[in-house]
């Protein structure tokens, strides 16, 4: 199980990374997260929508109401230029953390 702290820290870059390829609505984002994480990250509506609203208020996303292919009215989110810049910054930071941890964790020492 992944800690709530790590999930919270990774939410923004994950959402921005998903939306960089095009607009999506909340349920699609939740399903995409589940898919890319192999089911280890299971987001809920209650977790996602407040984050989307904060990101929109912060200028990282814009939204619009649109009828989906299924004929339902849904709120679609799209990344802004500011969101792209934020994603670039987040990506650099996470890559640095990943690089440092990779060096520390490979190979794992045996416990004797």
PLM-predicted stretches and their roles:
Residues 59:
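Glycine-centered, phosphate/nucleic-acid-interacting loop/turn motifs that mediate DNA/RNA or nucleotide
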Residues 85-112:
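Amphipathic alpha-helical dimerization/coiled-coil segments
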Residues 69-91:
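Basic, amphipathic "hinge/linker" alpha-helix immediately C-terminal to the N-terminal HTH DNA-binding motif
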Residues 63:
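Short beta-strand "wing" residues that participate in macromolecule-binding interfaces
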């Amino acid at each position: 199980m992944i800690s709530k702290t790590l999930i919270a820290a990774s939410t923004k870059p994950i959402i921005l990374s998903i939306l960089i390829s095009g607009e999506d609505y909340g349920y699609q984002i939740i399903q995409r997260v589940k898919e890319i994480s192999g089911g280890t990250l299971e987001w809920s509506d209650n977790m996602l929508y407040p984050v989307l609203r904060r990101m929109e208020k912060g200028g990282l996303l814009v939204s619009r109401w649109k009828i989906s292919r299924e004929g339902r009215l849904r709120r679609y989110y799209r990344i802004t230029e500011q969101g792209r810049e934020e994603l670039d910054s987040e990506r650099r930071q996470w890559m640095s953390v990943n690089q440092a941890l990779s060096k520390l964790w490979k190979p794992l020492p045996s416990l004797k």
